[in-house]
Structure formats: structure tokens, C-alpha cells
Amino acid sequence: MSEDLSMKCGLEIHVQVDTNSKLFCQCPTNYKDVEPNTNICPVCIGHPGAKPMPPNKKAIDMAIMVAKMLGCEMVIDKDIYFQRKHYNYPDLPSGYQKTSVPIGEHGTFLGVGITEVHLEEDPGQYKPDLGTVDYNRSGTPLIEIVTDPDMKSPEEAREFLRQLLRLFRYIGNLRGEGTMRADTNISIKYNGIQGNRVEVKNVNSIRGVYKVLKYELIRQKNVLRRGGEIKLETRAFMESQMITKGMRSKETADDYRYIPDPDLQPIVLSNDWVEKVEAQMPETPMNKEKRFVEQYGIKEDDAKVLVSDLELADVFEKVVAELGNDKDGISLAVTWIRNELKRVLVYNKIEFFETNLKPEHMVELINSIKDKTISQKIGKTIIEQMVEHKGEKTPKELISEMGLTVIEDTSELEKACEEAIKNSEKAIEDYKSGNQRALNSVVGQVMKLTRGRAEPGTVVEILKKKIDG
Ligand SMILES: [Zn+2]
């Protein structure tokens, strides 16, 4: 029997704003670096009667920027209330979470509708296995992005989150990697039967979201196939087992008994305010990719790789500017940044920003190759060393320390060539009988003997002279 299966997925994504102080008090937000329950005050641990301060300005600015970057319409000249969202959990001492009504609405990102963007406070951290709660995180500003249920496969949701995290890095001031959490909503239709929506709470990685969707797709399909019913419910993600488990039947908005927080003035955004934030907005990755192709005439694939990492893209532009913004300069920059540097980064599983390499380092290296101080092969070794030394040594220092400058002394080169010829009887024979390519292995030997410090062109010249006589 043929199967007709489709799914719809929507996400509620939470990301922390990198502010110094919390959303409604002046406690610091570096909760990961300090002893439990030290960054706390009556406001952020919800003492009755503790009066919150007006919301952190930077947090609001960042929420505006995220909403704008996601193409939202901003809520202008209207009261944006903070509401009390009531629920009972050990990480929430006041019994309610302060969460704003939308700051921006009706956006779109990668073809997925953005329902709304709003601001809220992070709760504390409850550790059920220890029975302890750490309130250091409580009150840290969070931006929540709610999408429409537009994603149709686990792969699409995964790509959406990857691109969103990349956007967070572009925007800056957000703690994307490491703090991103997503509530994942999924419903499926199987052979004409529509299941109810299931929510899986607090999935804290892209891989987790992907696994949840894969798992739920199969679980829900199996329930419907057996003639069962998909309940409207909230499930938990058991990360160690990569499965989901029923938690409770889904709350409706009524269960949270939302009321505007009487202790907090609503935010009112003006066009002026939004324009000021917009003036500081960075170029989006998509626009940068397009601009790279148009401005530098590089391949779309190369642009994609460079733009996937904001720092790498910046270095590329700075290096091109230094080398001369022409065909040669651009092609050198593509070779040594997009190909070679990227290869070393991927091999070491690190991002460019973790290497402490500076654009000047790349310019110095490329110039050394251009003026033939070092061979291309040595260039590759130096790049590996630059990454390994985390930018502490300049290419010039590494080249001289390792004694890797190109051999200028012809007698030294001739000696290496003679030795290589001596060791390559078969190849020389082949070459003499007309196989030009046989010479490559002899050149390779010379490179080995000189530890790559020979210029291949010069080597071929000397070899030919010696063999052809
Ligand atoms: Zn506090």
C-alpha cells in the first residue's frame, strides 16, 4: 500500500542576549563562570514585593535588530507589555516568567514565516538529579523567535537553525552557540488523517531538533497507522537516548493565566528608535554572498564557503584590499583563504575566530609565495603551523625558524637533482623514451630531498639539462 505522509514543523527558538546585567536588575549575567547562587538579588529570585527595574536597553535593541533581520514588521507606537506567564517549576521562584508581547511580527527567513519576536527572562537552572536549583541564570535576557509551522522535513528545520545561528553570529551580542534552545512543534498527516500538534520542549542543539523530528515523524506515523490518535501534548527530549517521552497534555494560553505585569511600564517603540538600531545593523549573510559574487567575480560556491564564517569573510575582503583588488589578488586570496586555510580549519575542527590569525598574517604569507620566497608547498606547511601556533608567530618568523626559504644556491639544487636522477633509473628511462610525465616523480624526489624548498620550475629546468645533456 502506498503511503502518503507529510509533516509540518514550527519552532520557538530562544537565544540569550549578551548583556552585562540581567533584564530587570543589575546582577551580572556570567552565570557559567561563578559559584551557584551568587549572581542573585531579590528581583531575579522573585522575592514578593521586589520591584523590577525597567528592562535592559541593550536587550531591547538586540530584539529589535533580530526582528528586523528576520524581516518583521515592528510594533510601533503601541504598548508592548511584559506579561506574567504563570507556571510552577523549581527554576521559577516567583511562579511566573516575565515575557513581552511581540516586538516584531510577520517576518520571513529562508521562506519560513516568522510569527513573532519578543523578549523574556531566562529562568534559573533546576537539576532534578541533585534536587538543587541555581538562580544565577534567572533573569538573563532572552529573545524568543516563533516561526510559523512552515518546515516540512527534519532536514529543512536543521538547515533553518544552522542559518539562524549563522545570522546570530553576524548580528553579534547574542549567545547563539551554547545557549540556543528550541521548543519543537510537529504535526503529521498520514494517509489523509491529520494528527494533533505535539510539542517537544527545550531541545538545546540543532542535532537534537533534527533527532526529535526524525523520531516523532516515525512515532506519530506508527500511532496513526495502527488507528490510534495523536494527542495534543507536550513531550520531553531524552537526549541520552535520543527519544521523546510524554510529559503532560498541552497547556493552552489559559493555563498560563497571562496578565500584564503591574510593576513594569510597557515598552513603546518609535520609528526613531528602530531607525537608530537599523543604522547599526550588519549585512545579512545572504546579501554578503550575493555581493561577493558580484563584486569579486568569484564562484557562488566559494562565496558560500567564505560567507559561512563572518570572520573568514572579513579576512578575505581585507586580504583582497591589500593584495590589490584585481583578478590576480582575488584568485590568490581565494586559493589561500577559501581553499588552503579552510582546509586546515576543517582538519583541526576549529573556526577562524579561534585561531587568532590576523589578516596581516595571511597577506604576509601570500606575498611570500607571490615573490617566491617560499614555494606553494611550503606555503601549505606554513598555514598549518600558523593555525597550530594560534597566530602567535608570523609567517616570516615560521619560515625562518624552520629554514624553509626557497633554495637560491644553484649548486645545492644541482646536487639534489643529481641524487634524484641516480635514484630514478626507471623514470629516467621512461622519460627518455618519450614519456614526459615520468619526470614528475623525479621532481617529487628533489622536493623531498630539499624539504619542499625548491622551486618546481627551476628543478624541471635543471633536470632536463642534466638528462638531455
Ligand atoms: Zn538580580
UniProtKB/Swiss-Prot annotation:
Superkingdom: Archaea
PROSITE patterns membership: GATB (PS01234)
BP GO terms, sorted: glutaminyl-tRNAGln biosynthesis via transamidation; translation
SMART domains associated with the record: GatB_Yqey
MF (Gene Ontology): asparaginyl-tRNA synthase (glutamine-hydrolyzing) activity; ATP binding; glutaminyl-tRNA synthase (glutamine-hydrolyzing) activity
Signal peptide location: none
Segments forming a coiled coil: none
EC number of this enzyme: 6.3.5.-
Record-linked InterPro entries: Asn/Gln-tRNA_amidoTrfase_suB/E (IPR017959), Asn/Gln-tRNA_Trfase_suB/E_cat (IPR006075), Asn/Gln_amidotransferase (IPR018027), Asn/Gln_tRNA_amidoTrase-B-like (IPR003789), GatB (IPR004413), GatB_C_1 (IPR042114), GatB_Yqey_C_2 (IPR023168), Gln-tRNA_amidoTrfase_suB_CS (IPR017958)
Alphabetic keyword roster: ATP-binding, Ligase, Nucleotide-binding, Protein biosynthesis
Catalysed transformations (reactions): L-glutamyl-tRNA(Gln) + L-glutamine + ATP + H2O = L-glutaminyl-tRNA(Gln) + L-glutamate + ADP + phosphate + H(+); L-aspartyl-tRNA(Asn) + L-glutamine + ATP + H2O = L-asparaginyl-tRNA(Asn) + L-glutamate + ADP + phosphate + 2 H(+)
Role: Allows the formation of correctly charged Asn-tRNA(Asn) or Gln-tRNA(Gln) through the transamidation of misacylated Asp-tRNA(Asn) or Glu-tRNA(Gln) in organisms which lack either or both of asparaginyl-tRNA or glutaminyl-tRNA synthetases. The reaction takes place in the presence of glutamine and ATP through an activated phospho-Asp-tRNA(Asn) or phospho-Glu-tRNA(Gln).
Quaternary assembly: Heterotrimer of A, B and C subunits.
UniProt similarity note: Belongs to the GatB/GatE family. GatB subfamily.
The protein's name in its UniProt record: Aspartyl/glutamyl-tRNA(Asn/Gln) amidotransferase subunit B
Species of provenance: Methanococcus maripaludis (strain C7 / ATCC BAA-1331)
